[in-house]
Amino acid sequence: MTKTQVDSGWWGFWRTVPGDLSLMVDAVLSSDRVLDGGRRTIARMLMADVVPQQRWGVFAPESRKVHVAAKNGWGPLPDGYRLNSTGWVSGADRDYVLSILSRSTAGFSHGRRTVNEVADICHSAMADGLA
């Protein structure tokens, strides 16, 4: 992760690029480089079992066909809301990491819709749509 700068402990305020986040998720969730099998399973469970209000971004569109383990981050800054979603998608002939970073000058709700739309486009591009 050569292009990531952590200015505070709050996930939404990291300065990074999608490639770095994807490398991190891949290292933690889909290989033995960081976590052994048991710990990786726990991390996947924790990142998959989130409250419904936080099931957006990489989680969208909701589908029973695939397993998604993701982390979303968001927060207000003077020039707009930052909304990040990164995670691992597996099942139904899929196995990939997706990271989406955004800035919304129109607020959280607009940013969340935009991130969901980008996720939907990416999921569809990776294979047949999930709907």
Predicted regions located by residue number:
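Penicillin-recognizing serine hydrolase domain
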Residues: M1-A131
